[in-house]
Amino acid sequence: MSLGRLEAFSDGVFAIAITLLVLEIPVPSVEHGELPDALLDQWPVYAAYVVSFAIIGIIWINHHAVFGYIERVDRGLLFLNLNLLLWVALIPWPTSLLAEYMQAGGTDERAAALVYALTMTFMGASFGGLWLYIAHRPGVGAVSRLQPVEVRARTRRFVIGAPFYALSVGLALVSAPACLAVNAVLAVYYALPGGGAIEHLGDTSKGV
């Protein structure tokens, strides 16, 4: 399989997932004159939408970045990429769940936040695993052209997410808004410049 085909498939999954988020924003059904208050009451929906949109968008940008280091697509890379896409495609569901129950209080609020936090944790771990495979699998990545210090810097950047997403799992048991806030901070972190310019290196037409 060519790298271009793999990227096109991945881009399609990202595009669908990020589009599905907006479909979860409900149109309030209210009496005349009650719409402004009803729209304000939906703030958890907007907050969850913005954070999840940012996360999916930034995952897509960094996915493109790490794919710039691929020289050859093999079966292991295919399955690791599919694993990442599994969690990306799932994000709209826990986003809707969190938005619905963020102010519910008690067990329902914590359960919704926990599902959201776990989804993001597995997504972060999957992305880190994908990068480690590209960086260390002989013949797959072109990272040998980088200085070791550059590889370590990128590894820290792409692997550090999972432990911090896991922190949001603990917060989910206390406060759904706090859980969402941690994910928002992580989105900002990964949106910041880092890692330098990315180029597609090597012959990307080779495949399994």
Residue map of PLM features:
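Multi-pass alpha-helical transmembrane bundle typical of ion/small-solute transporters
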Residues: 1-208
